[in-house]
Amino acid sequence: MTTKNMNTPPGSTQENEIDLLRLVGELWDHRKFIISVTALFTLIAVAYSLLSTPIYQADTLVQVEQKQGNAILSGLSDMIPNSSPESAPEIQLLQSRMILGKTIAELNLRDMVEQKYFPIVGRGWARLTKEKPGELAISWMHIPQLNGQDQQLTLTVGENGHYTLEGEEFTVNGMVGQRLEKDGVALTIADIKAKPGTQFVLSQRTELEAINALQETFTVSERSKESGMLELTMTGDDPQLITRILNSIANNYLQQNIARQAAQDSQSLEFLQRQLPEVRSELDQAEEKLNVYRQQRDSVDLNLEAKAVLEQIVNVDNQLNELTFREAEISQLYKKDHPTYRALLEKRQTLEQERKRLNKRVSAMPSTQQEVLRLSRDVEAGRAVYLQLLNRQQELSISKSSAIGNVRIIDPAVTQPQPVKPKKALNVVLGFILGLFISVGAVLARAMLRRGVEAPEQLEEHGISVYATIPMSEWLDKRTRLRKKNLFSNQQRHRTKNIPFLAVDNPADSAVEAVRALRTSLHFAMMETENNILMITGATPDSGKTFVSSTLAAVIAQSDQKVLFIDADLRRGYSHNLFTVSNEHGLSEYLAGKDELNKVIQHFGKGGFDVITRGQVPPNPSELLMRDRMRQLLEWANDHYDLVIVDTPPMLAVSDAAVVGRSVGTSLLVARFGLNTAKEVSLSMQRLEQAGVNIKGAILNGVIKRASTAYSYGYNYYGYSYSEKE
């Protein structure tokens, strides 16, 4: 008696555990496939890591300092807070066509020279074998387009400085140091360091193509936020070349920054040179007006209060004039919504308000004092402006001649000694993981999609009795593997002679032992039947019904019973090949009335039983099986044999089994392990029952011992036995 634990969760938990065990079993069953695929991907990753071209990285560090401005802006720092250097515009400037274009022109990066290797693996193999790459120095090259497309020329190195240049429409010989011209192509080779026979591919791209290619491998980033430290990096397969390129970019950026600063100083100097004559003229006029007025008023002097007001007014006017000069320069650099520009406008507004206040104090003074104060203010203000402009002119002249910009190169370009790509260890690990993932995924996906019956319990869940589980015979499988791999159709394979007969050739095989267990079960199942005729059919083709029926006939014949095997598969029966007997006179000839029984019954001495083969394939198999001669044959056989086994076509393919089944006492249906689904078996049983056939149950044939089915359904077989694990 089995005791159940009432505290156990619902059956879903157990089913989940079974499914998990089944998946684990699937992985174990296909471990060779998983190991092979994983090893393959790992080897591919290793090969890729070894053969792929190493990519190196060079870097340089550039500092962008806060702009100090020119002399006109030198006094503005007290009005605005200190600001960090703006790196974003400088990063864009470094990656601009203006900077990169100069580098391309300096280093002739439009000219492309590549040594020709065997495709895919040639370059990597040459590197692994430490073969020194060839060198080709070009002093001048011009390759025009051909039909609107870029040309590629092949240069083959010859002996003693000679070479051959081959294009799409020409082949010409050349010499190192001599200019070669052909069909618009101009080439001067300065030096060749390569073995004779080495080939190089020459091409020339446009400046824009070269810039785009450079931008793909060149990056600029700020080392830390608002630090002004820009890190320039470049990747490539030539360490020396990327170092030269990076140094060229940094130097070109530095030179343009200095040139830009000098240009700003030059513009400011030109502005001051235009303003100085005008300011000097206005100062002379103001002094003359003051002198004339004093002469007219007998040298009127200002009192102490007026002098104090005059000093304040002159101070305010000087600041306003200074702001005017600053605004002229700032307007060239910033818009009015910029913080620097806004600070200047706010300062101007404050000074204007102060000047209005002072003007009110002046308006309260006597008229004579007011006029003297006004004229004196004009003189003092003009003199201050003039002196200020003179000082600024001198400062700008010095600044222009010694401009250094606000950029400096901190670290020149250096290429890291170790390549950044490929990352060999990472690639191997990723290859291993990818191979493992794909192989495991394929196994699990196949397991999920497979719907074939793999355990008797799957049939019993549909109310189908399982009389036997017959394991796959490894011995028979090895001997028929080559035949199954033949490209012929199933019918042609069945015509192949000398097919091994397992029950006789290897009677100790586990499949034969399982059929012996089936013999015992049938003995009790047929005790109450109306006759001793057994029909064996299948759900679909390739279920193994002929193997089961023929092996069963041999096993029963070995127990000293008289057995008749009838091949009723008039379409594709192949028992004559299995038994190596003649097929000239068979069941179809008897049913058609062409032959009598004594002519169609043959004895299979090797198996110890009689055989009626299918005969020649008739045009109307079903109609022949429905004739009275078939019923008469079965009645005669029932009287003259201890057991009659009828092998019929698959039930779902044709209805022949339903026709024959009405005349037999017992019927069994063969289902192939992993091939037939429970639904197919159930549907076949229903059709037989609807036709009035006494169908006893099913036989699960070709069972493969797998960890997945053992873990999932918990059965093991030896012969016919299987047991549930509680």
From Swiss-Prot:
Topological domain ranges for the Periplasmic compartment: 54-424
Gene Ontology annotations for the cellular component aspect, listed alphabetically: plasma membrane
Membrane topology of the entry: Multi-pass membrane protein
Pfam families in UniProt: AAA_31, GNVR, WZC_N, Wzz
Membrane spanning stretches: 33-53, 425-445
Catalytic activity as recorded in UniProt: L-tyrosyl-[protein] + ATP = O-phospho-L-tyrosyl-[protein] + ADP + H(+)
Sorted UniProt keywords: ATP-binding, Cell inner membrane, Cell membrane, Kinase, Membrane, Nucleotide-binding, Phosphoprotein, Transferase, Transmembrane, Transmembrane helix, Tyrosine-protein kinase
UniProt-listed Enzyme Commission number(s): 2.7.10.-
Uppermost EC category: transferase
Gene3D superfamilies to which the protein is assigned, alphabetical: P-loop containing nucleotide triphosphate hydrolases
Cytoplasmic compartment spans: 1-32, 446-726
GO molecular function, one term: protein tyrosine kinase activity
PTM description: Autophosphorylated. Dephosphorylated by etp.
Compartment(s) of residence: Cell inner membrane
Broad class of where this protein is predominantly found: membrane
Highest taxon of source: Bacteria
Family assignment from sequence similarity: Belongs to the etk/wzc family.
Protein name: Tyrosine-protein kinase etk
Protein's organism: Escherichia coli O157:H7
